[in-house]
Structure formats: C-alpha cells, structure tokens
From Swiss-Prot:
The keyword Iron does not apply. SMART domains: Ribosomal_L15e. GO terms for biological process: cytoplasmic translation. Keywords: Ribonucleoprotein, Ribosomal protein. It comes from the Archaea. Residues 70-90, 163-179, 187-197 have a biased composition (Basic residues). This is Large ribosomal subunit protein eL15. GO terms for cellular component: cytosolic large ribosomal subunit. Pfam families: Ribosomal_L15e. It comes from Methanopyrus kandleri (strain AV19 / DSM 6324 / JCM 9639 / NBRC 100938).
Amino acid sequence: MDAVSMYKYQREAWKRPKDSYVGELLKERLPKWRKGPSVQRIKRPTRIERARRLGYRAKPGYVVVRVRVPKGGRRKSRPKKGRRPKRMGKNKFSPGKSKQWIAEERAQRKYPNLEVLNSYWVGEDGQYKYYEVIMVDPYHPQIKSDHRINWICQKSQKGRVFRGKTGAGKKARGLRKRGKGAEKVRPSLRAHRRRGK
C-alpha cells in the first residue's frame, strides 16, 4: 500500500470512528488521556494524515500538543455580592468561540514561545473533547529557512491564535462565508456591533 492510499484509508476511518478501527483505539486511549494533564506535549501526531494536511512536517521546530477541554456551557462563577437573581449573570452565557479555539488558546498559554499553526479533533467522551494542536517555533533556524512555513516568523503572526487567525478562529468569526449574507462579518464582528453571526 503506497503512502497516498494509506493516508486516504486513515482519513476515511477517522470520518466514522465508531464504524472503524479508530473506535477500538479510542476506547483504549481515552481513559489514559482523561487521567493525564490537560495540556500535554506528545512525540508525534495521532492522526498523521490530518496533521500533514494542516501543515505539520516531521522536522525540528514543529511541536504537537494534545489539549483536553471540558464539554458543556461556560462555567461562570456566582457573584459574591448580593443582587436579584435576574442580574446574577451566571447561566446561559456562551463564550462565543468553539471548544477547538479554546484548546488552541490553552496550548498557546502553556507554550508562549511557540505559535499555533492549526489543530484537529482526536476524540471525545462524556466529559471532555480532545484536540491536537500543531505549534511552530518561529525562532528555529530550520523554520526560518523553510519557504513553506517561514511566514509564521513575521511579527504580524505573534499571538495569532488570540486574534482569531487560525482555522478554528476564522470559522468562529464567520469568515468562511462570503458575499450575500456575510455583510457584517468584515472587517470584524466588533465593527458591526456583533451582528454578523
């Protein structure tokens, strides 16, 4: 089986995890991931075909981090001071960003010297969702000399995940849509008083 067909086989298996060998792998791995740290650096990607499509290369300067994010709505703490229940502002609040984007931000805070390139889903159970985040060292000589990735060394890419410049961030900002119906997502949601989404 050549490399192209192997990647295609893996891609099809991950599309329907429960119907393929992936389901058995996740049953084995998820309990271990649940017990481990919430942000953990790993040696190599779990989904090599997905990681490579998103820009990962097996060379120095690339780092893969697995992040665990709790499922469900936002956990807002209850205000200590008194007020009527209507003004508590505790329930039914949404963070306005996906779990994947939150996972990318957590990886960035853990490794502030790296930059987030992209991320992908690797599993979920009743409590958590798990994502793998591809990170790049913009100061590494091999990254600086690689014309395919050295754009991430520019100053304008610093802290890109916090400004919604990754794939998950752009999706949450509504930037996948163009033309009719997307008049209020550009130049930004804030410029249109959050009416774009």
